[in-house]
Structure formats: structure tokens, C-alpha cells
Amino acid sequence: MILRGLLNEEDIERVYSYANEVRDGMPPDEEGGWVRCTPGHEKIFLHHGGRMRDAVWRTFPEVCPAVMSKLLDAMHSSPLRASTWKRTSLALQPDLHVRCVEFHKYTAGGGLIDLGHIDIGTSLTMSVQLSPPESFQGGLFTTTATDGHVTQHKLNRGDAVIFCSESVHNVQTVEGGTRNSLVVELWTSEPNRVDRFH
């Protein structure tokens, strides 16, 4: 499910500003900070916060409350939320909470190429493209249906894709430029305050 223009320019600049402060205040590979996934692909965990330039620790919802509300409202109101469980009544479905908010950066040679990649343990995932499509080559976001059909999603800056987390999804290899995205995962456990795996 694609939501066109979910984030506007102001929202996106707030995300970039916060991610840059978190990155600047956290050494590479420090637990809970930012990590290199593969050559050409790194991510920063934003949900639990980071040390700002004034040396105060602040979380993403504290710094970007309007953006966080917009993201969560879109996910909770998505019809995919109801299809995450095989139950007929929304009242019987468990509440969803934030598992992680991640800022992803892909440069030439980077991608997420895994024919079986799913978000294990998560219920609903959103990926928002932060970069304008003309700023990179390749790097299309794809989802794979149960019958094996692959859909390439051509996204503009601020567009979001929402999908059931157990759906196979990938990012094709970036051939040039820089592709940035914001990923939000919701799960049925309590809100996560550390890295993605706790």
C-alpha cells in the first residue's frame, strides 16, 4: 500500500536534522547507535534517542512529535493493520507499539538483496523514501507476493509504503548517488527503548 506525499518537505528536513545529530553524537557501531549493515548501507536507530549537540539525550518522538504522530496515524489507520491477524474483530487484535524507527542510507553498491527478507517478530512496517528519485540510480523498493510476483515501487520524496512485516521486501542495489529512507516497525510487545532486537 503506497501513501503518496505522507511526509512534506518540513517533515523530511526535521528527520534529517535529528538523524544527523544522533549520528554525530554516537561513535560507529556503538550499541544502540548507528551500524554499517553492508558496504554501501548503514542505518541509525532513532526510536530510543541520541545525544544532541547540547549534550542532552532526546528521543525521536520528543524532537519530531508531529512527524511521529503522522507516521503512527497512517500505520494504525491502514487497512493492512486488520489483515495482520486472522481475526474478524479489531477489538480482539493486540495493540501495536513501536519496535524501531530507523534511518537508512544507501550509497553506490548498497542495497538489501535477500530473496527471503522479512521483518521477523514485527507486525506492520512502513518505509518512507526521503531522497528525491533523481538523486540516486537503482535502489527501487520491492515487495514480493506469495506467488513470487515482484512489485517495484517507484516512490517520490515523502512517499511511504506500508506492508505486513512478514511480506518479503528488498531494496535493489543503488548504482549511484545516495538513497535515504525512514523505516518504522510496529509489534505487539511493549514499546521498545533499546535497539531493534530487545
Where are these regions (language model features)?
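Non-heme Fe(II)/2-oxoglutarate
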Residues: 1-93
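Catalytic core of non-heme Fe(II) oxygenases with the double-stranded beta-helix
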Residues: 80-198
